[in-house]
């Protein structure tokens, strides 16, 4: 945990206007050079039962600059020590939220399905947390569930009680005012890593981009051997 590290990550709600890199200007001089922490390679070590090992070796830093020209992005990138740079033109991909480019393999890569073809993303995630003594920090979560906010997937959580639970919840019980466009609504709330179980009595209402309403609850965090990374859930269409 490091106070102030939240300043170097994108807005965790998924609000596209809250990226760390400023909006790309048509005026070249207004586009800054950014130092990019490349994070880690995907971990390959086998973790202890109930633990995770998602991060491998650190990948170091690069410097990047993004320009725009004729509706395309011009990505300039280089190692920190070099005085020259590589440059590639990246076109927007119709029907997709993003076009992804790997600075390691130096090519466009497929990461997500088409924008309207998915609702939930099971992933590692960088959240922003409040520190006990004040200030904020960036923090990495495993077993995180994000919603597709750019396709306006909405959700809210419900704590079951004696009168309302997952089994008897119906379309008439949906509170449309409670539906939110924030990719953290499910987040890490659905599971308890200390007990290796799902959060009891919690279920979710989800509305997809077509207006379909579902109820969903998680049934497992680990597999039969106690290994994380095997979430299970059930869901039902309400309308």
Features from the language model and the residues they span:
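Surface-exposed, beta-sheet-biased, low-hydrophobicity segments with strongly acidic/polar composition
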Residues: 1-239
């Amino acid at each position: 945990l490091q106070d102030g590290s939240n300043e170097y990550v994108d807005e965790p709600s998924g609000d596209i206007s809250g990226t760390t890199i400023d909006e790309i200007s048509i005026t070249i001089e207004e586009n800054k050079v950014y130092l990019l922490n490349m994070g880690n390679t995907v971990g390959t070590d086998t973790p202890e039962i109930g633990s995770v090992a998602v991060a491998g070796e650190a990948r170091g830093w690069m410097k990047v600059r993004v320009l725009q020209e004729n509706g395309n992005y011009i990505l300039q990138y280089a190692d920190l020590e070099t005085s020259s740079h590589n440059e590639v033109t990246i076109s927007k991909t119709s029907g997709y939220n993003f076009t992804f480019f790997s600075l390691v393999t130096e090519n466009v890569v497929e990461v997500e399905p088409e924008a309207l073809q998915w609702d939930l993303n099971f992933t590692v995630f960088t959240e922003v947390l409040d520190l006990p003594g004040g200030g904020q920090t960036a923090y990495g979560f495993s077993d995180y569930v994000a919603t597709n906010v750019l396709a306006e997937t909405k959700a809210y959580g419900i704590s079951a009680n004696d009168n309302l639970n997952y089994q008897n919840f119906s379309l008439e019980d949906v509170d449309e005012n409670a539906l939110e466009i924030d990719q953290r609504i499910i987040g890490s709330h659905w599971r308890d890593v200390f007990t290796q179980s799902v959060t009891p009595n919690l279920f979710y209402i989800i509305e997809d981009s077509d207006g379909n309403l579902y109820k969903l609850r998680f049934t497992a965090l680990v597999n039969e051997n106690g290994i994380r990374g095997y979430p299970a859930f059930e869901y039902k269409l309400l309308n």
